[in-house]
Design a protein with these regions (language model features):
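N-terminal Rossmann-like NAD(P)+-binding domain of SDR-like oxidoreductases, especially those catalyzing
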Residues: 1-190, 306, 322, 332, ...
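C-terminal substrate-binding subdomain of Rossmann-fold SDR/epimerase-dehydratase oxidoreductases
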Residues: 17, 209-341
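NAD(P)-dependent short-chain dehydrogenase/reductase
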Residues: 133-144, 165, 169-240, 254-256, ...
Length: 341
């Protein structure tokens, strides 16, 4: 039986990958995370499988390299997903984003170099090339050969992207030395149930629940291609199983929509009948983002199947049910994600 390790398996994407492997692959799965995403220290998806003899869960701070010692050294597949992420984090504590993400990367690379693992997938982001689109007008949809650009190295917004650029280079160049095989996946606006609160779709739910009127649409003409979690998970697993060593793959969807279209769709689902008004978005937010996924389709046979309308509806329904349950539970929705009301 093959063995998989998910570094950062307590997060949104990591916990869904864990579920996929346990239900769709004959793998033993180890998960290691500091579980900081949840104030309770628990991840509902993982709790479902806690009694499985194919799953082991480790709670550890991997900025301390000695905490890798509790792991095996011979995994067939390693998913490196751990990172400090979020617009709130890069704006509030950019120095911590740099410190934590850099240490996670370097500790993981050094542990892998001393181990005998097979293939590694490193999770990157479309943020790595966001500056290129704005500064140089590269084509949208955008493929993997786009140069990576940081418009202002001093701006806190780019700290996350800079650490992901470091990770892409680090994993590819360690793989080039023969320590392991590595592929990189760049995620593009992954969303779905239980994604947390600091994302555009659950944030829209919260705002509509407050009956804001007029409802402000921030960056109404900006466009994104949203990638449902089930498709992102499958793309990631296919990348580590089938991807070419030292290659980068864009994992996303090619259906580009405007923020206005998304907002009005969510409003309709939530029976909003008030007015809308346009408002400026956050500084540094790119005007368009949509991946060219031709390479992933050809190499991985990756084909996202969940249309955005279907995925958004499923996500909204999940949040409505969760919020309804949180009203009577001791731990509120906000408490779970450590959010100050």
């Amino acid at each position: 039986m093959k063995k998989a390790l998910i570094i950062g398996g307590g997060g949104f994407i990591g916990s869904n990958i864990t579920q996929f492997l346990l239900e769709n692959r004959d793998y033993n799965v180890d998960v290691i995370d500091n579980f900081s995403r949840s104030a309770s220290g628990k991840t509902p998806l993982l709790e479902k499988y806690r009694e499985s003899d194919r799953l082991k869960i480790f709670n550890a701070d991997l900025t301390k390299i000695e905490n890798f010692d509790q792991l095996d050294r011979d995994y067939d597949y390693v998913f490196m997903l751990a990172a400090m992420v979020g617009v709130d984090k890069v704006n509030a504590v950019p120095h911590e984003v740099i410190r934590v993400n850099s240490m996670l990367l370097l500790n993981s690379l050094e542990w892998l170099r001393a181990s005998s693992c097979g293939r590694v997938v490193f999770s990157s982001t479309s943020e790595t090339y966001a500056g290129t689109i704005e500064a140089f007008g590269y084509d949208v949809p955008t493929n993997e050969t786009v140069p990576l650009t940081v418009e202002d190295v001093s701006h806190p917004r780019f700290t996350y992207a800079i650490t992901k650029m470091l990770g892409e280079s680090g994993f590819i160049n360690y793989a080039r030395q023969g320590y392991f095989e590595a592929v990189v996946v760049r995620y593009h606006n992954v969303y779905g149930p239980n994604m947390g609160f600091r994302h555009v779709i659950p944030h829209l739910v919260e705002r509509f629940q407050k009956n804001e009127s007029p409802f402000l649409i921030y960056g109404h003409d900006q466009t994104r291609a949203f990638n449902y979690i089930d498709d992102a998970v499958l793309g990631t697993v296919l990348a580590v199983e089938k991807g070419t060593n030292q290659e980068i793959y864009h994992i996303g969807d090619s259906d580009e929509i405007s923020i206005e279209t998304l907002t009005c769709f969510v409003g309709k689902l939530l029976n909003y009948d008030g007015d809308y008004e346009y408002a400026p978005t956050f500084p540094g937010s790119v005007s368009r983002r949509c991946p060219d996924i031709t390479k992933a389709k050809n190499d991985l046979v990756y084909s996202p199947s969940v249309k955005w309308q279907e995925g958004v509806t499923s996500t909204i329904n999940w949040y409505l049910e969760y919020l309804k349950g949180a009203e009577t539970s001791q731990e509120s929705f906000y408490d779970q994600y450590g959010i100050k009301q």
